[in-house]
Structure formats: C-alpha cells, structure tokens
C-alpha cells in the first residue's frame, strides 16, 4: 500500500537534487525509482497540482537521467507500468511479489527483457531518440468526462509512447487545469494542445465542433491568452452553457426515477434503485456532468441486480420443466 511520504523521504527525494549527485549515496537506484513511481501515484489520488507536478518531475529525473542503459525511454515506460500493476494488486500479496521481481529485473535495462515486458503490457517499442509520430487528438481528463487528472493523463500518454495529444474541454477551461496540463506535458516532453468543444444548433439539431487555438511558444503564452478580455468573456459564456447542460442532465435523472426506473423494474422483475442526485454529483467529482456520466452511474447501480437476476434464472433453469425452459 502507499500513502503520504514521510518528511525524511521528502528530504532525500528532493526535486532539486540530481540523480547522479548526493542521492546516489543515500540508497539504491532501484529503490529511488520505485519510490518515485509510488510517490507520483499517491499524489495522483490525494495531492494537489503542485505536488503532482513535483512528483512527475522527480520520476522523470529518476527514470531518464539516472538510467544506466541506452534503452532508457522504453525501460522507464515498462517500470512505471509495472509499478501501476503493483499498486492495483495491493490486495494480492503473491501477485505483488511477482511484479516486484519483474520490476527488479527490468531496472537492469536489458533490451531483451524490456522488449519482453513491452509485449506483455501491449506497449509498442518506441525509438530511443523519442522522435516517433504518435498522436491522440481527442482525449478528456477529469475536468470533463475523463477519470484521470491532467498529470495522470500525461503520464499515461508518455507510457503509451504518445508525443502529440489534444485534450478537449467542454465549453470552457479553467486556467488552473490548463496550467497543470501544460506544465505536466512540458516535463514529459509531450506536445499538448487544448481544445474547446462547443455545441451549436444546425438544421434543428446540435452539432459539435472543437476549437484548438495554436501558435503559443510556451505554457505562459497560452495562459496569458486565456486571461485576455475576449477569452474571459467567452469562458464565462461557456460556463453558462455547462450549467445549462448540468440542469438538463439532472432533469433527465429525475425523469429516470419517475418513469424509466419503475418501467424497467416491472419488465425485468428486478429492483431498480432510484438515482440520488447528491450521490450522482459525488460520482462525477470535478468533471462536468454529462449523459455519459449518467449512463455509467445508472449502469453501475443496476449491474449487481442484473447479475443476481441472471444467477437466479440459471439456477431455476436447472430444475425447470422443458416447457418452462422454453
């Protein structure tokens, strides 16, 4: 398991200390890399944006600057992926021990071993010059309908070998969210663009389009652009549009409770729980409420009842007459 780092560990793993400096006197290279990944994953869940960015910078330094292999980029990608699997397996000690053994082997940077684990985790080998043309031009973070904050999103893009990415926000983007995304991308060497998705009436229906401003030299230039008066006015209008959409989604939730849930319960002969608005908003978290969130939440609350109903029907089928089975 992992949690907040201790004060002593914060001092030892100071981002201002170079991996080839005094850190080499404190502990082993493997331990520092493992700690860097755990520190980042812990901050992804509980830390603020500055903590996440600091943890990402420390991880980048440990993975790339202290690597003792010419295969450092691919080695780093595999190591982070293995550590993510270790965290996910926290309830299975045997699996964790096997993964720790794999982590220890990969830290050697042996190209044959690294390629083996790239294949295991379905990751493509990338050139060590890091000049591949890999793109993903429409992804979302936790500020819209995604589940990953900006730092987590960039880290996963780097693991997959993506160098060019467009992160799309609905109607507006908060400067703090843009700052974290741009700084995380700068740390990991990912070329990121921010897109704004708008919906507009067209021939009696809505169409969506994405506007991705370009031509900025660094993150501060884009943030200055967001602070300009016309952009501030546009973002305020975007917030109003998002509030309208939230009300529309919540009205649909009430319609589900009043009409569709009882009808589905009668048809499927299972209890269909009502959706609590407060619980639904807590499920959405920092994102913007959407019909995708509502569909996922309704499915989540309904799934266990569907599974129980299927099991009951399977048990009944074992003893039922042929007429009943048909």
Outline where the language-model segments fall.
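Hydrophobic, aliphatic-enriched repeat segments that assemble into extended interaction scaffolds
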Residues: 186, 191-213, 242-260, 289-291
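An N-terminally biased module of ancient metal coordination in phosphate/nucleic-acid-related enzymes
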Residues: 1-206, 213-219, 224-226, 326
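Non-catalytic, alpha-helical, charged scaffold/linker segments
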Residues: 3-6, 15, 20, 24, ...
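Noncatalytic linker/hinge segments flanking ATPase motor cores
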Residues: 173-182, 209, 235-239, 252-255
């Amino acid at each position: 398991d992992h949690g907040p780092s201790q004060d002593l560990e914060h001092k030892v793993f100071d981002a201002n200390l170079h991996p080839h400096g005094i850190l080499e006197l404190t502990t082993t290279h493997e331990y520092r890399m493992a700690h860097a990944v755990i520190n980042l994953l812990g901050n992804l869940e509980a830390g603020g944006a500055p903590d996440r960015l600091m943890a990402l910078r420390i991880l980048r330094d440990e993975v790339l600057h202290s690597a003792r292999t010419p295969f450092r980029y691919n080695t780093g990608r595999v190591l982070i992926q293995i550590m993510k699997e270790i965290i996910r397996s926290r309830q299975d000690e045997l699996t964790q021990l096997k993964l720790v053994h794999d982590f220890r082997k990969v830290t050697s940077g042996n190209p044959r071993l690294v390629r083996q684990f790239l294949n295991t985790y379905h990751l493509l080998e990338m050139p060590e010059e890091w000049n591949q043309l890999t793109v993903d031009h429409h992804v979302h973070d936790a500020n819209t309908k995604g589940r990953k904050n900006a730092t987590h999103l960039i880290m996963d893009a780097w693991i997959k070998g993506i160098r060019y990415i467009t992160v799309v926000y609905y109607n507006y983007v908060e400067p703090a969210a843009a700052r974290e995304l741009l700084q995380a991308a700068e740390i990991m060497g990912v070329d990121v663009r921010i897109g704004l998705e708008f919906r507009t009436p067209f021939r009696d229906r809505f169409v969506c389009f994405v506007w991705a401003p370009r031509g900025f030299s660094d993150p501060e230039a884009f943030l200055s652009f967001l602070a300009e008066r016309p952009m501030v006015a546009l973002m305020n209008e975007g917030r109003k549009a998002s509030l309208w959409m939230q009300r529309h989604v919540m009205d649909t939730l009430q319609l589900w409770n009043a009409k569709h849930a009882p009808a589905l319960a009668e048809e499927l002969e299972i209890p269909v729980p009502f959706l609590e608005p407060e619980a639904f908003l807590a499920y959405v978290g920092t994102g913007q409420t959407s019909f995708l969130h509502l569909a996922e939440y309704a499915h989540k609350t309904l799934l266990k009842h569907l599974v129980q109903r299927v099991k009951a029907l399977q048990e009944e089928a074992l003893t039922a007459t042929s007429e009943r089975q048909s």
